[in-house]
Amino acid sequence: MAKYNDSKCRICRREGGKLFLKGDRCYTDKCAFDRRPYAPGQHGRARKKNSDYAVQLREKQKVRRMYGLLEKQFHSYFVKADMSKGVTGSNLLSILERRLDNVIYRLGFANSRSQARQMVRHGIFTVNGRKATIPSIQVKVGDVIEVREKNRKMPVIAEAQEVIARRGCPSWLEADGPNFRGVVKALPQREDIQFPMSEQLIVELYSK
């Protein structure tokens, strides 16, 4: 699991946008980025012209930190995406979206990806009836993700329907809150990812 010593709010401010690292708090007026939408530190407000490399690096760091990954694992996903058929950038985002911890987050069973990762490691979910404890599992079309019966009274699980109503569920997933389950209906497409990101900049960075 990727660990950062810096506060999550400072990470968002450094990357210049909300990465939703603190879950529901990011949707409220308590969000630090809404109050101070500039980089942390003494010179955070200063305007500076970034080189092409700096822009590419910043975009890669933003996406990597949003999904909570270390550089080695993120780069391995890029290599896999580059070797697959299709557009490398779109392939990369599809791989990131199909991680089990991200799917748990998208289904509304966790407030953030980091919380989803922790819940998966604790064995709270099953995939196709088998307990899953590896956050990086790549889900496939037709996979059924369920909350284990003994964990269904957890507050964060009980609030799943409310979270889905507030945050929405992507079209490639089907959330069934009352039955504590979700189904992968299709593979995620680029248009399914609403978060503003320029994956082509990441491709350009790693292609140097």
Curated annotation (Swiss-Prot):
Domain S4 RNA-binding intervals: 98-161
Listed GO CC annotations: small ribosomal subunit
Keyword Manganese among UniProt keywords: no
A matching Pfam family: S4
CDD domains: S4 (cd00165)
SUPFAM superfamilies: Alpha-L RNA-binding motif
Keywords from the named record: Ribonucleoprotein, Ribosomal protein, RNA-binding, rRNA-binding
GO molecular function, one term: rRNA binding
Database matches in InterPro entries: Ribosomal_uS4, Ribosomal_uS4_bac-type, Ribosomal_uS4_CS, Ribosomal_uS4_N, S4_RNA-bd, S4_RNA-bd_sf
Example GO BP: translation
The protein's assembly and partners: Part of the 30S ribosomal subunit. Contacts protein S5. The interaction surface between S4 and S5 is involved in control of translational fidelity.
PANTHER family hit by this protein: 30S 40S RIBOSOMAL PROTEIN, SMALL RIBOSOMAL SUBUNIT PROTEIN US4M
UniProt similarity note: Belongs to the universal ribosomal protein uS4 family.
NCBIfam families: PRK05327.1 (NF003717), rpsD_bact (TIGR01017)
Described function: One of the primary rRNA binding proteins, it binds directly to 16S rRNA where it nucleates assembly of the body of the 30S subunit.
Protein name: Small ribosomal subunit protein uS4
